[in-house]
Amino acid sequence: MSAKYTLIFALAALCCLVFSTEAAAQRSRVLSSRRGSELVEKTSDNKEDSELAAQEQDLERQEQEEQNDRLEGRSDDVAEGSDNKEDKETATNNKDTIVKPNKDDARARRIVRAGRRRGGRRGGRRGGRRSARKSVRRGGRRGGRRRGGRRGRGGARRRTSVKRRSGKGNKA
């Protein structure tokens, strides 16, 4: 008697498993056929459907490229832009400057230039070396006789009161 019940229970579990996997597959098919927020209706003609989908993808790609061009401030006259670059090769080439559409706005350029390549006293996006910036690892005090310590840098005068002792007893 118990063997019969276990067989029925196993059959019921198998049916539940089949139904749940079928429902999950149907859900994933519905999700994969979505474009944006609307549902693409499936037609009997698959060729027309695939052509429409390809056209939509091409349109979306073109719109994204146009948007990227507008964001980066690229001009259609490439020659004019290169002439301007030849005239103005100065101290800005070591900074990461993003070309904005309104180049006359100096404040916007300063804000963009705030992000430098390395993490110094004020590097990155405004902040100095933070814990998230693990790629820049430095050892030691990075001061000393050869490097010059903080001489000629901001805050050098304030830091002279704190003297570190070297073992040789030279008093400065």
UniProtKB/Swiss-Prot annotation:
<feature type="compositionally biased region" description="Basic and acidic residues">
    <location>
        <begin position="35"/>
        <end position="50"/>
    </location>
</feature>
<feature type="coiled-coil region">
    <location>
        <begin position="45"/>
        <end position="74"/>
    </location>
</feature>
<protein>
    <recommendedName>
        <fullName>Protein nemuri</fullName>
    </recommendedName>
</protein>
<keyword id="KW-0964">Secreted</keyword>
<dbReference type="GO" id="GO:0042742">
    <property type="term" value="P:defense response to bacterium"/>
</dbReference>
<dbReference type="GO" id="GO:0019730">
    <property type="term" value="P:antimicrobial humoral response"/>
</dbReference>
<feature type="compositionally biased region" description="Basic and acidic residues">
    <location>
        <begin position="58"/>
        <end position="90"/>
    </location>
</feature>
<comment type="function">
    <text>Antimicrobial protein which is essential for the homeostatic regulation of sleep. Promotes sleep following sleep deprivation or bacterial infection and increases survival following bacterial infection. Likely to promote survival to bacterial infection in two ways; by contributing to the innate immune response and by promoting sleep during sickness to aid recovery.</text>
</comment>
<feature type="compositionally biased region" description="Basic residues">
    <location>
        <begin position="109"/>
        <end position="172"/>
    </location>
</feature>
<dbReference type="GO" id="GO:0005615">
    <property type="term" value="C:extracellular space"/>
</dbReference>
<keyword id="KW-0044">Antibiotic</keyword>
<dbReference type="GO" id="GO:0045087">
    <property type="term" value="P:innate immune response"/>
</dbReference>
<dbReference type="GO" id="GO:0030431">
    <property type="term" value="P:sleep"/>
</dbReference>
<keyword id="KW-0929">Antimicrobial</keyword>
<keyword id="KW-0399">Innate immunity</keyword>
<feature type="signal peptide">
    <location>
        <begin position="1"/>
        <end position="25"/>
    </location>
</feature>
<feature type="region of interest" description="Disordered">
    <location>
        <begin position="27"/>
        <end position="172"/>
    </location>
</feature>
<keyword id="KW-0391">Immunity</keyword>
<feature type="compositionally biased region" description="Basic and acidic residues">
    <location>
        <begin position="97"/>
        <end position="108"/>
    </location>
</feature>
<keyword id="KW-0175">Coiled coil</keyword>
<keyword id="KW-0732">Signal</keyword>
